Amino acid sequence: MMKNILLYKVLARYTSTKAARFVPKTGVYPKGYEVGGIHCGVKKDGKTFDLAILHNTHGKDASAAAVFTTNKFKAAPVQVSQKLIKETKGAGINSIVVNSGNANAVTGAQGMKDAEDMVIVTDSVLENKPNSTLVMSTGVIGNNLPIDNILSGIPKLALSHLGNSHQNWIDCATAICTTDTFPKLVSKQFTIGKDTYTLAGLCKGAGMICPNMATLLGFFVTDAPVSPSALQLILKYAVDRSFNSITVDGDMSTNDTIAAIANGAAGGELIDLNSSCAERYAELQKEITDFAQQLAQLVVRDGEGATKFITIKVKDALSYKDAKSIASSVANSSLFKTAMYGKDANWGRILCAIGYADVGNGSVVPQKTSVKFVPVDGSESLQLLQNGEPEKVDEERASEILADEDLVIEIDLGTGGGQGADFWTCDLSHEYVTINGDYRS
């Protein structure tokens, strides 16, 4: 009991302020979807939402795409959804069902059956064709689902609690959370040519977050008309530059899934891979990538115990791959992250992480490398290293910059390659240990 109280106090410390800042009061939502969330009995407190459904109501089959964890212990829902995407090639996937509080990972044959049953029951209740639903789970690894609770909860949710109001979307976003301190929901309208479309997305994640996705679930939906093959390529590009460019603690989970559904309810010309669609394709790719970055950054801002949001910006690398590898190396350094928590301008830890990044010869030349702190308020940056030469650091100015919640660290490799990448991370605090030390209690 005391562990639960302590964990609650740690989470509550962050919840009120972050929720007020990052949970939207209103939203704009795409045509032809209904969503919702309820408590069905996965979580033990008897009231916290733990079951979510999204459903395409447009009347025409949607296109779908998904990217999944690279962890070798893929959870049952990941395997089931991966198989569905492969078999359907993304055509005719019209719903998503998610439970939180239990990952259904490393649960053997029973876990596979449970994930498949979630698909079957959801399809039946929503009057979908068979195999039209993606399934996701998140929570504690190694325990079987309370599947009877979930299977009885699906009809209750699907028949009585789905809609397209802002509250429906908030309920859906809340129902997929675990240690998150606020639901993560973003929506916007955009135009391609003369057509106006809407994009909405939600995700969960606060710990076990690192590239190639972690305990991270999310989905984007749009009313734009997009072919499955085009949507898959766009999603992969966007995720690589968003959810695969964040880290909280360097741990990769068994359950990661990011999915996208496009139902075409807003009309307009189909966006596919034909050369005639190149301009519309590029515009949609940019919109979804920018959108994915917004959502991914919310995950970092809600990092377990985090007090800082840090952007690692690498410039003038030989390739995008090099830039991302170097940014990732710094972002995942525990020594760097603890220094940021302690407001310590120990830039040697940044250089150390740059130096062991997995890049080729010539990718990092110490004599050409520069590093600086860039305040987000627009005030003057603080140069730490210039072309391999250390600068005399104004410790008082460094403390002022590091006292802010947001910080940009700019690394200029000076290679002449002109390539760059951004990576987002947070600090590593005492609270992170407290939260994860008590996670199962």
UniProtKB/Swiss-Prot annotation:
Heterodimer of an alpha and a beta chain. Keywords: Acyltransferase, Amino-acid biosynthesis, Arginine biosynthesis, Autocatalytic cleavage, Mitochondrion, Multifunctional enzyme, Transferase. Its EC number is 2.3.1.35, 2.3.1.1. Catalyzes two activities which are involved in the cyclic version of arginine biosynthesis: the synthesis of acetylglutamate from glutamate and acetyl-CoA, and of ornithine by transacetylation between acetylornithine and glutamate. It comes from Lodderomyces elongisporus (strain ATCC 11503 / CBS 2605 / JCM 1781 / NBRC 1676 / NRRL YB-4239). This is Arginine biosynthesis bifunctional protein ArgJ, mitochondrial. Substrate binds at T178, K204, T215, E304, N436, S441. InterPro entries: Arg_biosynth_ArgJ (IPR002813), ArgJ-like_dom_sf (IPR016117), ArgJ_beta_C (IPR042195). Pathway: Amino-acid biosynthesis; L-arginine biosynthesis; L-ornithine and N-acetyl-L-glutamate from L-glutamate and N(2)-acetyl-L-ornithine (cyclic): step 1/1; Amino-acid biosynthesis; L-arginine biosynthesis; N(2)-acetyl-L-ornithine from L-glutamate: step 1/4.
